[in-house]
Amino acid sequence: MSAYIIETLIKILILVAVFSALGGFATYIERKVLAYFQRRLGPCYVGPFGLLQVAADGIKLFTKEDIIPQGANKFIFTLAPIIAMVSAFVSMAPIPFFPNFTLFGYEIKPLISDINIGFLFFLAVGAAGIYAPILAGLASNNKYSLIGSARATIQLLSFEVVSTLTILAPLMVVGSLSLVEINHYQSGGFLDWLVFKQPLAFVLFLIASYAELNRTPFDLLEHEAEIVAGYCTEYSGLKWGMFFLAEYAHLFAFSFVISIVFFGGFNAWGFIPGGIAILIKAGFFVFLSMWVRATYPHVRPDQLMNMCWKIMLPLALLNIVLTGIIILI
């Protein structure tokens, strides 16, 4: 077995282990952040500052009975959370998380694969995760799950169109779909960040990413007040945990991608080294998603569709036209 294959396998194992751990810890952070905004304590009983709440939740999920409803399609019911997990982790393959570094005289590239269409690969594979809520809802033999899967189809497909059109303008400026090249394009300094050249694209992509991630205020797929837990209504134990681990893994992936595409990625930020800089940026966008969840109310399905097709889509197309004109001039 070649050294390249061994290195790639090690990277995959590290990526899955790290982001699985981060996904579990993110539940604790989010509960603490929401508690702060709502003037309460959040997790505080299990361990110091409630830090062992993550371990307690993990033990609970692993030991709960795995229930499959009567009349459900067992194979598809089991396959759905696996699709969610695979989609979330495979989409991370082209993301350069840190600058290259040397270990024992061997140069390490902290990404799985530097493919020329890295950004498109990230969006396409991430969008394949739409099959998870669709299949979960169809296989559960539950009306609330079915409504949740129908909402998933409409919401995720609609905003996938917007996010794909939104990234065209920044890609026209850079001239490459590779996330490594996009990061390198912004290596000249603070003023080279694409957020200053494409502010509208940044805002549209950020909003579309929240809709694709099923984050508040766009969490119509599992809106408790209307459809119980949506497509997850009949899930319990480890399968339920897999859905939400995939959601947090996607959140971290989008946070890194937004940091790379619009905020200079892992290029050094003044006196701050590049590796620390990208962690600060990605951490901020994870926190921002939690802040938005604590601040904004849910939107109605009709409001969501109106915003997508009547506001965001025309703005994305306008941004493409204006960017093309500026480049030609």
Swiss-Prot record:
Subcellular location: Cell inner membrane
The enzyme's E.C. designation: 7.1.1.-
UniProt topology in membrane: Multi-pass membrane protein
Catalytic activity: a quinone + NADH + 5 H(+)(in) = a quinol + NAD(+) + 4 H(+)(out)
Listed transmembrane segments: 9-29, 42-62, 75-95, 117-137, 154-174, 188-208, 238-258, 269-291, 309-329
EC class name: translocase
Keywords: Cell inner membrane, Cell membrane, Membrane, NAD, Quinone, Translocase, Transmembrane, Transmembrane helix, Ubiquinone
UniProt GO BP: aerobic respiration
Main localization (coarse): membrane
Primary role: NDH-1 shuttles electrons from NADH, via FMN and iron-sulfur (Fe-S) centers, to quinones in the respiratory chain. The immediate electron acceptor for the enzyme in this species is believed to be ubiquinone. Couples the redox reaction to proton translocation (for every two electrons transferred, four hydrogen ions are translocated across the cytoplasmic membrane), and thus conserves the redox energy in a proton gradient. This subunit may bind ubiquinone.
HAMAP family: NDH1_NuoH
Family: Belongs to the complex I subunit 1 family.
Subunit structure: NDH-1 is composed of 14 different subunits. Subunits NuoA, H, J, K, L, M, N constitute the membrane sector of the complex.
Record's protein name: NADH-quinone oxidoreductase subunit H
